[in-house]
Amino acid sequence: TDASHSIGANFISDEIYHGIQYEKKAVSALEVTDECYVINSFSKFFSMTGWRVGWMVVPQNHIRLVERLAQNLFICSPHVSQVAALEAMSCEEELSQNLNVYHKNRKIIMDGLQHIGLQTFAPPDGAFYFYIDISKYSDDSLSFCNDV
């Protein structure tokens, strides 16, 4: 945050995938400072993609500014989405089960990649995306993916 403030910028943390961690807990920007914007959603961790429900935490002195901006950009999420999102927050057992499925799938993919010779990759520590080094097979990732 010091770096962003030194150039007159605000620090924005996209925390859409928080909650989907495997090895260690992700740190929220709010654990470091209150002088940040945090963007989050029910889409990923709560498996509510398409329900159009999310939230934003802003510094106290910017709340009214963001409210005015939001009033001109969108109205609100559908009522049914808001009710479902509130209920989803109390579904701890289901959320834990979902995370276990992600964790098992992550292991299957990691083992499978190693089995087929793709042994250099960054395992996902949050979310479920793999960044794989394919340089010994191709220098063109698009062609490689099309061939696969």
Regions found by a protein language model. Give the residues of each.
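PLP-dependent class I/II
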Residues: 1-148
